[in-house]
Amino acid sequence: MTAPANVRVRFCPSPTGTPHVGMVRTALFNWAYARHTGGTFVFRIEDTDAARDSEESYLALLDALRWLGLDWDEGPEVGGPYGPYRQSQRGEIYRDVVAKLVEAGEAYYAFSTPEEVEARHIAAGRNPKLGYDNFDRHLTDSQRAAFLAEGRQPVVRLRMPDEDLGWDDLVRGSTVFAAGSVPDFALTRANGDPLYTLVNPCDDALMKITHVLRGEDLLPSTPRQLALYQALIRIGVAERIPQFAHLPTVLGEGTKKLSKRDPQSNLFAHRDRGFIPEGLLNYLALLGWAIADDRDVFSLDEMVAAFDVVDVNSNPARFDQKKADALNAEHIRMLTAADFAARLRHYLDVHGHRLALDDAAFATAAELVQTRIVVLGDAWDLLKFLNDDEYAIDPKAAAKELGPDGAAVLDAALPALDAVTDWAAPQIEAALKTALIDGLGLKPRKAFGPIRVGATGTTISPPLFESLQLLGRDRSLRRLRAARERAGQHSA
């Protein structure tokens, strides 16, 4: 598909709650399409619901996009030619558009209460829950004046066309809603405040949005929006109707939509575990799109080069935490050693984990765990033995490795290590192999298990000889001597 010369897409969340991975997937697809086409990515805040919106959630949205590296060309804190980009600051714009729609006969004042609408349906033998019946379309001036004299406050409703409303969805193909299936709908509350049904298409029109990429859950609102776009074009507010692409639902367990109550829906929970942006974005891209049939791992740049919204699959996509974890591990392994060390240092600092290592030693420690972790949070359990206040021998590990055989190993290992003058991994390895494998005739697992438990407190650690080097000579020998005493207790 060839996109128009000036693609303009938007991401327009409401600032409620914590950023959701389904919402972030929508942001990613919009961002990638803008970057692929050389277009513009607009970030707009839909904060017209004062009861639910919060400044904390607004700041969380900024934090989320910045952490992921999804930069916006227009929007909050960046500006642009069609601002302001927070709907709470655009009230006058909406009131002006509503006045023009009413003046042109595209919209009208409706005074009916929900109870009156239900009563009319019942009187006509219809289902009382059918919704609005378009009754106020036909009010006379005197009827309207009488309602106003009663003190009634009207809403403003759009006059829906008496024809089918359809569009060629870029993901789902031809989609049609039959004439009469959507009643005239409210654009404002009775107090005059604009509703989402007005502000969303109104802003898209004024901000010259060309493509609307959004979740499938919003598909039923599309015929209303098409009718509003047509009216906005007729009154000179809109230039065009954008193209629509409804992205597949993200599922959680079973066939249920991933909801805010599902822990894996929380973007920041993944960040706290130690996902890196590259890994999470790669996985989210796969929720409805693929770069190739035989390839799951790719960079953001590679996604941008390949992404076209018409290639998005319409089938629901299930969020699979294990697959997300595996992709994150791949991206961690793809980082340069220096980049990984910097990210790990920052992650540990943020989470209050301090390793008393200088930069060179930390770089060595980071390199030891880079291929052994799935998320950054896994590194702490592997490295915390380097802190004396975190070091403790696990009882199960002691029972396994610090028995009579372990005592014999440590009796041979301690003098061999004591004689090492240049405390570095190759020399440590040579001394232990000579003493334990050559001297005692042990296999490596039997030889090194007691050393690992004595030095790190556990049976699972980074490579042993490098771990001893990082611990340093004095601490290594001190821990191993204490382990030998403990092994003596086990062997008694």
UniProtKB/Swiss-Prot annotation:
GO biological process: glutamyl-tRNA aminoacylation
Subunit details: Monomer.
InterPro entries linked: aa-tRNA-synth_I_cd-bd, aa-tRNA-synth_I_codon-bd_sub2, aa_tRNA-synth_I_cd-bd_sf, Glu-tRNA-ligase_bac/mito, Glu-tRNA-synth_I_codon-bd_sub1, Glu/Gln-tRNA-synth, Glu/Gln-tRNA-synth_Ib_cat-dom, Glu_tRNA_lig_a-bdl
EC number: 6.1.1.17
Source superkingdom: Bacteria
Catalytic function, reaction form: tRNA(Glu) + L-glutamate + ATP = L-glutamyl-tRNA(Glu) + AMP + diphosphate
UniProt-recorded Gene Ontology molecular function terms: ATP binding; glutamate-tRNA ligase activity; tRNA binding; zinc ion binding
Residue ranges annotated as motif 'KMSKS' region: 257-261
Cellular localization per UniProt: Cytoplasm
Residues that hold ATP according to the record: K260
Motif ('HIGH' region): 13-23
UniProt KW keywords: Aminoacyl-tRNA synthetase, ATP-binding, Cytoplasm, Ligase, Nucleotide-binding, Protein biosynthesis
Similarity comment: Belongs to the class-I aminoacyl-tRNA synthetase family. Glutamate--tRNA ligase type 1 subfamily.
Enzyme class: ligase
Classification via Gene3D superfamilies: 1.10.10.350, Glutamate-tRNA synthetase, class I, anticodon-binding domain 1 (1.10.8.70), Glutamyl-trna Synthetase, Domain 2 (1.10.1160.10), Glutamyl-tRNA Synthetase, Domain 3 (3.90.800.10), HUPs (3.40.50.620)
Membrane spanning stretches: none
A cellular component term, taken from the record's GO annotations: cytosol
Keyword Transferase part of the UniProt annotation: no
KW Nucleotide-binding (keyword) present: yes
Purpose: Catalyzes the attachment of glutamate to tRNA(Glu) in a two-step reaction: glutamate is first activated by ATP to form Glu-AMP and then transferred to the acceptor end of tRNA(Glu).
Name used for this protein in its record: Glutamate--tRNA ligase
